[in-house]
Amino acid sequence: MYHNDKKYALTNCVLLDGSEHMEPQTGKAVCIAGETISEIVDAQHIPAGYEAVDLGGKYVLPGLINMHVHLPASGRPKKKASDPKKLVKLITFCALTNRIGVSMCEGYAKTELLSGVTTIRTVGGVADYDTKIRDLAAAGKILAPRVLASNMAVSVPGGHMAGSLAYEAHSAEEAAALVEKIAAEKPDLIKLMITGGVLDAEVVGEPGVLRMQPELVKAASDKAHSLGMIVAAHVESPEGVMVALQNGVDSIEHGAQPSDEMITLFKQRKAFQISTISPALPYALFDRSISHATYEQQENGKIVFDGIVALAKANLAAGVPVGLGTDVGCPYITHYDMWRELHYFVKYCGVTPAFALYSATKLNARLAGIGDLTGSIEADKQADLIVCTNDPLRNLSALRELDMVVKGGYRIDKPQIKKMDGVERELDKFL
């Protein structure tokens, strides 16, 4: 069982507590009892009964929170695209294949944790795998992050991920009924696929074409809200963002070119954006001989990339919250590279490393509805922490190799991850 029943104190460290400016604090000890941070004290005043763990001057910060995860895929690029519908049909064929599928997703969740991500928010998965893994992780039966689970999403015929990671709704009534069906599995949120994406577009200039009509969006959102769940939506066009915000969506996943009206709607709805620069970058910036993208996919990738960045900048300037997620599972987007999304946020949106770290920890926790539980290093919060040798405020690549991951007090020293060398090599060209 992956539980901690000991008392220990992390000492001789530089503390970055998750607050917006991430001011480094020295001379402190983080005291952990069981799953929680019991107190933060001066290092010379560690309470009796706590084992002192000397970190040798290393950096301690909150565990990262990845707000946009698809557990069933590794991110390994393929020269030839496979049919996701056939793959999902194969993996859900019988009890044995389902067990294999859940086990595979458990492995990917473990990789997220070993990379320093102590909470994931899933936004489209196979069957009820997400909630199964959430419950196993919460019970300490598997080594995995905290999971905020969506299970299957709701799409429309011909829509994004329709028939694979999303059900198909043919009407507003069916959209609401599908939300009820998903809700029976006790997920934490509902995911809608409102527009197409880069791979769905058939001609240049049409990424994110509107697939789900406004009345379906409203019916699904209203039903989700009536059941106490927020609604996240895949959106990659200005029209799609407006339809989403006008009809009850709470979080815009990805984004598109902003307008004044759009930003006003974000504020009125108290909605937020989850910026996902990572999946657009390979399509937009890689040579096509490497990405294996068609000309249309590359050009549309550039449109989506520019739209996500532009909306994030506009939202930041207007005070609209912008959280971070990787869209892991897309080609070249692995379960161990959340740190790259922070780096891209700095590079393309102009924020500081401190603000990127805050966004991926305390802010993401608040947007996910778990700000009272995790996201910062404070007394009575969950002991979800990471430790690195180098200063992430100077270079976020310090998060690439960690010395320790702590999830709910359970300590993992020197976490090891098998990485994809070719993927690392290509992505490193764009640091």
Predicted feature residues:
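Metal-associated gating/positioning segment near the N- to mid-region
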Residues: 59-136, 215, 247
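Divalent metal-dependent hydrolysis catalytic cores, especially in the metallo-beta-lactamase
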Residues: 94-95, 105-130, 144-153, 187-201, ...
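Short, acidic/polar
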Residues: 101-109, 170-183, 236-240
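His/Asp/Glu-enriched, well-ordered alpha-helical/loop segment
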Residues: 226, 295, 306-389, 431
